Amino acid sequence: MSKAGASLATCYGPVSPHVMTKAENIRLLILDVDGVLSDGLIYMGNNGEELKAFNVRDGYGIRCALTSNIEVAIITGRKAKLVEDRCATLGIVHLYQGQSNKLIAFSDLLEKLAIAPENVAYVGDDLIDWPVMEKVGLSVAVADAHPLLIPRADYVTHIAGGRGAVREVCDLLLLAQGKLDEAKGQSI
């Protein structure tokens, strides 16, 4: 790829060399929940129970990332037991819920994991995510993110939140790091 501005064709769509270079160095992937791991809809039952749908392809991608030595963390503005349960199922141990200021959790993660901001990717869908996204090495907005977030992100997924966008990002990181063919996940 010697032409300036040329893109790498992936199974999801084109990816710029600039994004691939940033993705090579990612050691921590931080995800929002509503609108990223889920489609952003919240179903409320008659007894106050909250339901969300999670995509198993995203789960497989997360497991592949974790088994390929990429840490995965969740920072979300809401608090829900089902998110805690989903994280436990996937093996995500870094969970921050009820975060109105996501920078506090971000700083805690950097210190706890001894990771520099340039080695972090963050996937978000709304303006609450931008303060962290502007500090990381690779900022990602899902395809159906808030219109003001999309032009600010380093990469915009080709797939919407809750529909496999996280799997797309996991595959991108693994491809950039030469680990995609050996990655092992689990359909959960």
UniProtKB/Swiss-Prot annotation:
Keyword Hydrolase appears in the UniProt entry: yes
Gene Ontology molecular functions: 3-deoxy-manno-octulosonate-8-phosphatase activity; metal ion binding
Binding site for substrate: 34, 55-59, 63, 78, 86, 102
Pathway: Carbohydrate biosynthesis; 3-deoxy-D-manno-octulosonate biosynthesis; 3-deoxy-D-manno-octulosonate from D-ribulose 5-phosphate: step 3/3; Bacterial outer membrane biogenesis; lipopolysaccharide biosynthesis
CDD domains attached to this UniProt entry: HAD_KDO-like (cd01630)
EC numbers on record: 3.1.3.45
Keywords carried by this UniProt record: Hydrolase, Lipopolysaccharide biosynthesis, Magnesium, Metal-binding
Catalytic reaction(s) noted: 3-deoxy-alpha-D-manno-2-octulosonate-8-phosphate + H2O = 3-deoxy-alpha-D-manno-oct-2-ulosonate + phosphate
GO biological process: lipopolysaccharide biosynthetic process
Cofactor(s) the protein needs: Mg(2+)
SUPFAM superfamilies: HAD-like
Binding residues for Mg(2+): 32, 34, 125
Family per record: Belongs to the KdsC family.
Description of how the protein assembles with itself and partners: Homotetramer.
PANTHER family assigned to the protein according to its UniProt record, in alphabetical order: HAD SUPERFAMILY MEMBERS CMAS AND KDSC, N-ACYLNEURAMINATE CYTIDYLYLTRANSFERASE-RELATED
Function: Catalyzes the hydrolysis of 3-deoxy-D-manno-octulosonate 8-phosphate (KDO 8-P) to 3-deoxy-D-manno-octulosonate (KDO) and inorganic phosphate.
Protein name (Swiss-Prot/TrEMBL): 3-deoxy-D-manno-octulosonate 8-phosphate phosphatase KdsC
Organism: Salmonella typhimurium (strain LT2 / SGSC1412 / ATCC 700720)
Gene: kdsC
